[in-house]
Amino acid sequence: MPLRGLAKAKNFTLGPTAPMKTFTENVHSQNNEINNLKKIDKTHNLTNNSQNEKLYKYESQIKSSFDRIVPTLKEIARIQHHEDFINTAQSISKQNLGINLPTHILDKSWVKPLDMRALYAWCAFKQHEKLSDNFFENDPLEGSFGSPNANNFETALLDCGIHLLDITPCSDGRLAHSVAYVMRIPFSAVRRRSHAGALFDIENTVNRWVKTEHKRYRENNPNEAHEDTRYLKIVTYHFSSVDPLHQGCAAHGSDDKLAAKEGSEKLLAFKEAVENSFCCGASVDLMLIGLDTDTDSLKIHLSSSDGKIDLENTISSLDIYNSTINFSKDEAEKEICQIISGNSNKVQLKGLDKFVYKLIVNNISQIDYVKKFHKGSYEDIGHAERFIGVGIGFKEVHLRNLTYFAHLDTVEEGAPDLDVGVKIFTGLNVSQDLPIPIVIRFDYSGKVPGAKERAAKDCYRVNNAISIRYKSLVDKGLLHTCLTIRDRDNIHSAQIIGMSLDQKTKEAH
């Protein structure tokens, strides 16, 4: 893929930057922890090694399918004037990528140079289609609705006093795997919507809370309304321990203190909105988590005595990993319990303490995942996404640096998120004369009459707005779009309803 190597460069940045806070000692401490991690040639006794092997196999399979696009197109470009070019090109594409190329583009190779930009975008879109088909048909992450993993996790959530888990990670592609990999949560058991800087829309989140509580009253789903459980809202911001000055959150100028502060403010505003708008003690639980995008370790912020989020006091999963690496399983579990609650018996853990315990144990497996398969710290410390996902949906995307998310209903309201994504891909792709692939998605409920048609209209509306906002890129063939819809009430993959690459029909005269 283009410019993937630049993601390794420590001075490479595409987002806006700002003066960093003075935390030199913390940076040195974090780097020392990473160096120590790399030296330890053993896995933690709490690590799920078999799960790690499955997850790595899936990650390798999907990413390699995208990374083979450029070498394949280079091979095809060299033979575009050969005899029987179209059949040979299709054979190469089928063998290397498992897809067919658009004949209406290949057909023109005898009169003008092959449109490699169009072919690149086509391949990216078709690989996403294959990813979606595989995800919903085969459940490679074993986290679909009704699966044993999902059922067990939902039961565990209720046992923690949580009836719904709602997570907002930053839209940065380095957090796209935060649910299924970093936290090891079955994707169907969590509500996930990414936003730049993890700065979610408060009104929309209140509306989702209302729908959740309504289902409890009307359907006893996931539990009865009188039961003492809460809606848990989590914000996941991110930082870089390897290059904190440049590879942190672009929306916050790589200032992780600012990212944590604004994430906390959003959470508290959401809680206040619920409490001010509804009676009878209505409230929610909150959690702020920092994710180190280099090691996938977590910093979980604790609640202060007045119920607010403590920005300074955190539990570090990497610290726990390093301090318990030589412990037996039982000893490590007791130590984690002691750190969380002050007692060493996990049976005595209650509520959010029990949930935090589960997160830390799960994340220890991910720390070992990065340690084993990525030498303790990811080589691509910066952006290396393969396409931009725009709209509402993308349940199937759970891999690091695969997709930059811009969740939106309209381009106007989602412009800040989308502009950041286009800026990132200007460095990754446009600088290499390759286009920005944008997959537009609107999920719909098949139970609602006319919902499918409205979702399709939303796709075309957003597509038109994108073509206007980024007209100069579109006119040069440096931005292409793929329009998709999906019925979220069924286990079906996304359906492509149109592309900017579709063959244009001649007008009748």
From Swiss-Prot:
<dbReference type="InterPro" id="IPR048619">
    <property type="entry name" value="CsoSCA_N"/>
</dbReference>
<comment type="similarity">
    <text>Belongs to the beta-class carbonic anhydrase family. CsoSCA subfamily.</text>
</comment>
<dbReference type="InterPro" id="IPR043066">
    <property type="entry name" value="CsoSCA_C_sf"/>
</dbReference>
<dbReference type="Pfam" id="PF08936">
    <property type="entry name" value="CsoSCA_C"/>
</dbReference>
<keyword id="KW-0479">Metal-binding</keyword>
<dbReference type="Pfam" id="PF20686">
    <property type="entry name" value="CsoSCA_cat"/>
</dbReference>
<keyword id="KW-0862">Zinc</keyword>
<dbReference type="InterPro" id="IPR048539">
    <property type="entry name" value="CsoSCA_cat"/>
</dbReference>
<dbReference type="GO" id="GO:0046872">
    <property type="term" value="F:metal ion binding"/>
</dbReference>
<keyword id="KW-0602">Photosynthesis</keyword>
<dbReference type="InterPro" id="IPR043065">
    <property type="entry name" value="CsoSCA_N_sf"/>
</dbReference>
<keyword id="KW-0456">Lyase</keyword>
<dbReference type="Pfam" id="PF20687">
    <property type="entry name" value="CsoSCA_N"/>
</dbReference>
<comment type="subunit">
    <text>Homodimer.</text>
</comment>
<comment type="function">
    <text>Reversible hydration of carbon dioxide. Essential for photosynthetic carbon dioxide fixation, supplies CO(2) to RuBisCO (ribulose bisphosphate carboxylase, cbbL-cbbS) in the carboxysome. There are estimated to be 29 CsoSCA oligomers per carboxysome.</text>
</comment>
<dbReference type="GO" id="GO:0004089">
    <property type="term" value="F:carbonate dehydratase activity"/>
</dbReference>
<dbReference type="InterPro" id="IPR048620">
    <property type="entry name" value="CsoSCA_C"/>
</dbReference>
<keyword id="KW-1282">Carboxysome</keyword>
<feature type="binding site">
    <location>
        <position position="249"/>
    </location>
    <ligand>
        <name>Zn(2+)</name>
    </ligand>
</feature>
<feature type="binding site">
    <location>
        <position position="170"/>
    </location>
    <ligand>
        <name>Zn(2+)</name>
    </ligand>
</feature>
<dbReference type="GO" id="GO:0015977">
    <property type="term" value="P:carbon fixation"/>
</dbReference>
<keyword id="KW-0120">Carbon dioxide fixation</keyword>
<dbReference type="InterPro" id="IPR014074">
    <property type="entry name" value="Carboxysome_shell_carb_anhy"/>
</dbReference>
<dbReference type="GO" id="GO:0031470">
    <property type="term" value="C:carboxysome"/>
</dbReference>
<dbReference type="GO" id="GO:0015979">
    <property type="term" value="P:photosynthesis"/>
</dbReference>
<keyword id="KW-1283">Bacterial microcompartment</keyword>
<feature type="binding site">
    <location>
        <position position="238"/>
    </location>
    <ligand>
        <name>Zn(2+)</name>
    </ligand>
</feature>
<feature type="active site" description="Proton acceptor">
    <location>
        <position position="172"/>
    </location>
</feature>
<protein>
    <recommendedName>
        <fullName>Carboxysome shell carbonic anhydrase</fullName>
        <ecNumber>4.2.1.1</ecNumber>
    </recommendedName>
</protein>
